[in-house]
């Protein structure tokens, strides 16, 4: 039994919803040979405490719809990328739009971005592929397209998103950037078009990710390889 336990790879799941955790546990049991030992945590604090005792091959963050918790999750993933570069990092997003934004604007490369809106079969397949480092060609192409789109954001557009993430209104952003309100609104709608979002909520998701991206870039300078 000890030998069998050692062979299993430890995977951490940070998920507040108990029912979701039970559902994901059942998917892990369906893997051929069940090569993983899943550890579930309801908070980042309990997960970080466990990291001092357990070596994880992969970490799965299930993002909440709450902005504050999503930002904390992104920051934790960024920190993991710096401190534990060999650990696989996966995200479970609330829907396809959030999954697309996270996949394209993530401050560091992710091994998988899954959507709760996916069918059970697709979710299970993507979970398996993400844990094993395999990517479907179509997924790579789609992700590359969104990455290319995000790179077309101008410095002004990125600043607008960062101000939005901090709670500034369009009028306040115009004052900060010394631009008229019509110009700021035009930039805003241009960003929405580039990122494929149709609401301020979608823009805020992108803004939160970009804010973490700036933190990641700073951390990489302070803590290079």
UniProtKB/Swiss-Prot annotation:
Pfam families: GerE. SUPFAM superfamilies: C-terminal effector domain of the bipartite response regulators. Keywords: Activator, DNA-binding, Transcription, Transcription regulation. Residues 170-189 bind DNA. PROSITE patterns: HTH_LUXR_2 (PS50043). Residues 146-211 form the HTH luxR-type domain. GO terms for molecular function: DNA binding; DNA-binding transcription factor activity. This is Transcriptional activator protein BglJ. It comes from Escherichia coli (strain K12). The gene is bglJ.
């Amino acid at each position: 039994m000890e030998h069998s336990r050692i062979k299993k790879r430890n995977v951490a799941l940070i998920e507040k919803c108990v029912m979701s955790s039970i559902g994901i546990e059942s998917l892990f049991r369906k893997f051929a040979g069940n090569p993983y030992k899943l550890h579930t945590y309801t908070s980042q604090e309990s997960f970080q405490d466990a990291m001092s005792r357990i070596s994880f091959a992969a970490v799965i963050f299930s993002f909440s719809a709450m902005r504050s918790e999503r930002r904390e999750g992104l920051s934790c993933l960024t920190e993991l990328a710096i401190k534990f570069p060999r650990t696989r990092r996966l995200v479970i997003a609330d829907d396809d739009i959030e999954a697309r934004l996270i996949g394209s604007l993530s401050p560091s490369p992710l091994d998988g971005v899954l959507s709760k809106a996916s069918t059970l079969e697709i979710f299970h397949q993507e979970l398996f592929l993400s844990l094993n480092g395999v990517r479907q060609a179509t997924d790579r192409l789609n992700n590359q397209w969104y990455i290319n789109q995000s790179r077309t954001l101008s410095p002004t557009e990125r600043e607008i998103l960062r101000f939005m993430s901090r709670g500034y209104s369009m009028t306040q952003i115009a004052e900060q950037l010394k631009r008229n309100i019509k110009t700021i609104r035009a930039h805003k709608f241009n960003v929405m078009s580039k990122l494929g979002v149709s609401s301020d909520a979608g823009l805020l998701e992108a803004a939160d990710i970009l804010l973490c991206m700036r933190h990641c870039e700073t951390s990489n300078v302070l803590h290079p390889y």
